[in-house]
Each structure stands twice: as C-alpha cells, then as structure tokens.
C-alpha cells in the first residue's frame, strides 16, 4: 500500500509540473487563488445572487443530463438489458394469475425497503447538507411504535394499515407484557434498512478519494482538497476541530477495519472524513464498506433505536409531562398541549379519533409538520446552491488556462 501511495504521489507531482508548463509556481500563491475561488463560489447562493444561482443550476443540470446521456449511449447493451428486464417485470405485474399474491407481497416488501434505504442515502449524501431523515422520519416512527406498544400492550398492529397508520389490535395484551426487546424487534427492519442506506451514502467520498489518488489528478471535491490541506498542516494544527479530524484520520489509517467500525458505530459528524481517508490511503473496498455497513446498520442503529425507545417509554413520557407542568408560572399552559396531543394519539390507537376530543389541530403536531417542511425546503435549496457552485467551478477551471497564458 505504501509503494502504491508513493507512485501516486510521484504521478501527481509530474502532473502538477505539466499543469504549470514547467514553471515552478509559488505554492502559497496557488493556495491563495484556490481560497479566493472558493470564497467566490460560496457567494453564489439563492439569497445573495438568485438569478445567477438559478441560471448556473439550470446549466449544471443540463451538463449532468448530457454526461449521463453520453454514458448511457456508450453502454447500450446494459440499457437494452435493463429495458428488457423492466418489460418482463411490468408484464408479470399486470398479467392476472395465481402469481399475483406473490407479486403483491414482493411489491410491499420492496417499497418498504426502498423507502427506508432511500431516506438513509439522503441522510448521508445531502449534496452539501444532509436531510436529517432520522430526526424527521425514522425517529418519529420508532417513537410512535413505542407509544402505541405501551398503550395497546401489544406490537401486533393490524396490517394494513400498519406501517402507514398504527391502531391497536382488537385483542389487546395485558398490562406489563411489553418488553424493550419486543419493540426493538418490531422496528428492526425499518432501522436496519435506514442504516444500510446511510452506509451506501458514504461510498461517494471513498470512490472520489480513491480515484483521485490512483490517477494523481486534482479532484473537484472541496472536502478532499481540505483533507489534503489538513494533511499538509497536520503538525501545526491547533484548533479543536482540526485535531478531531486528525484523530479520526489517524484512527482509520492505523487501526484499519476496527478503526472504521468504531467511527461508523458512534454517531459523529466526521465520518465523511473517514471515507475520504480510506479512499486516499487505498483501503480495500470490502474492508471499508464491510466495517461501515456493520457499524451503521447494526451497532449504531441499535444505539439510536434504544435511545428513542427508552426516551418515549410510557413512564418516561409521563414523568416529562409532569415535569413540564411543575415549571413555575407557565407550567400548566405548556403542559396542556402535550396532554392533548398524547390523549389524541391514544384515541386514534383505539379507533376513537372521531369522538371524545375536538378535531382541531394540536399546535405541537402543527409545529412538527412545519419543521419538516422547512427542513425539506432547506435541503432542496442546498442542492440548488451546490449545483450552481459546481457550475461556477467549471467556469473557473475553464478560465485558469487562459489566465496562465497571459
């Protein structure tokens, strides 16, 4: 591995010399120009330059579509095979017969798995900012199942409508029959699929860094450029953030599989750096992905799942509501919406949502719905800004050779 890294470094040095036409350019001036270009790109956002941002976003979209069209055109055999497979699956889906019961069962499981894996990928990739799908989707789902399990004294919710809607079964269990393990088992599939999605979402930084190291080319990714700058200034790093990043990099590089497993198992915002580090130091794919998959889909997922289940268990929730009511002065007014929300959820579980309480919307659920809308909108805005900045970088890269020849 060390020999491969040395060869890659030699190729990169050679390419840098060719890039500057044999002239030894001061590295500080090159870094200063990169910094100015990065700051210029960071100003291309919707709330500062809306027209330019939308224009660059549209042009970047067209460039990406053109690139993908070209790739698909050069892989016609794969495209034709995929279309034939799609035609066979479509015919199987719509043709009546005894096989339809199996088709419906497979469709249900496929959509369930695809939904949670997709949310996991969105949480990891994000194109600049992750869509925090654990807080928005998986966490509330686990909390709902936990509250329903303690209210119904059972996890055998009728299917359908579960998982779209949770209602108590006609024959409810006896008090105290619900265990922590039964709730963990009920949400295991959703949680594991979400964890698999987050592991898949960590692959792009790994492949980008690995390709850049093998080819010796300068990648377009700013995180990778920051990673290289961090390695160059490793000895002089003083701030906490830089030392934390270096600690992750050293752990992954020196410990290998178990270092990656440790980073993936503990919730932390620095795991993208682990993917870049593994790619940069040419860690084998299955070592990286295997450790990431085990860490995120099994260990980390059970930690997060256990935390949510304990936090939303019946006695903890009742204690929290009582604690809110004990706040001097404003306690009762703050406690009331929580009590109304919990009572409304209990009535829904027992098929009594149409009677007993008014149908007016609780402000607690209203706030959560608006929070989801705001976070999804911010995620979409971040994608637009990121793609616009990518197109601005294309323009800067086209202008650089012209500037050097002046």
From Swiss-Prot:
It comes from the Eukaryota. One of its GO terms (cellular component) is autophagosome membrane. Residues 64-77, 131-250, 295-306, 385-406 are extracellular. The modification N-acetylalanine is found at residue 2. Belongs to the VMP1 family. Interacts with BECN1. Interacts with TJP1. Interacts with TP53INP2. Interacts with TMEM41B. Interacts with ATP2A2, PLN and SLN; competes with PLN and SLN to prevent them from forming an inhibitory complex with ATP2A2. Interacts with ATG2A. This is Vacuole membrane protein 1. It comes from Bos taurus. The gene is VMP1.
């Amino acid at each position: 591995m060390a020999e491969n890294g040395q060869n890659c470094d030699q190729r990169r040095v050679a390419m840098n010399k060719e890039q500057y036409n044999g002239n030894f350019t001061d590295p500080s001036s090159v870094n200063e120009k990169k910094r100015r270009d990065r700051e210029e790109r960071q100003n291309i956002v919707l709330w500062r330059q809306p027209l330019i941002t939308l224009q660059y976003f549209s042009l970047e979209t067209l460039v990406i579509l053109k690139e993908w069209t070209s790739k698909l055109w050069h892989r016609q055999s794969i495209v034709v095979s995929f279309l034939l497979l799609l035609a066979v699956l479509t015919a199987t889906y719509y043709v009546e017969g005894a096989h339809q019961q199996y088709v419906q069962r497979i469709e249900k499981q496929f959509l369930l798995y695809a939904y949670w894996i997709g949310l996991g990928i969105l949480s990891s990739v994000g194109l600049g900012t992750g869509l925090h799908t654990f807080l928005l989707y998986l966490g509330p789902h686990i909390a709902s199942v936990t509250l329903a399990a303690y209210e119904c004294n059972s996890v055998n919710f009728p299917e359908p409508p579960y998982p779209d809607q949770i209602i108590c079964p006609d024959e409810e269990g006896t008090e105290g029959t619900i265990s922590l393990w039964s709730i963990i088992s009920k949400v295991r599939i959703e949680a594991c699929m979400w964890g698999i999605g987050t592991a898949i979402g960590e692959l792009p930084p790994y492949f980008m860094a690995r390709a850049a190291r093998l080819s010796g080319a300068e990648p377009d990714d700013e995180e990778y450029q920051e990673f290289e700058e961090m390695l160059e200034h490793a000895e002089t790093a003083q701030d906490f953030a830089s030392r934390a990043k270096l600690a992750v990099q050293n752990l992954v590089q020196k410990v290998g599989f178990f270092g990656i497993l440790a980073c993936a198992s503990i919730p932390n915002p620095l795991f993208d750096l682990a993917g870049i580090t593994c790619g940069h130091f040419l860690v084998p794919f299955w070592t990286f992905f295997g450790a990431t998959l085990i860490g995120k889909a099994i260990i980390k997922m059970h930690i997060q799942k256990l935390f949510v289940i304990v936090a939303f268990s019946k006695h903890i929730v009742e204690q929290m509501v009582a604690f809110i009511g004990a706040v001097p002065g404003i306690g009762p007014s703050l406690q009331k919406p929580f009590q109304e929300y919990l009572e409304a959820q209990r009535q829904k579980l027992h098929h009594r949502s149409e009677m007993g309480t008014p149908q007016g919307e609780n402000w607690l659920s209203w706030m959560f719905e608006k929070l989801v809308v705001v976070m999804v909108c911010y995620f979409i805005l971040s994608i637009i800004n990121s793609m616009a900045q990518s197109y601005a970088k294309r323009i800067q890269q086209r202008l650089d050779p012209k500037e050097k020849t002046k």
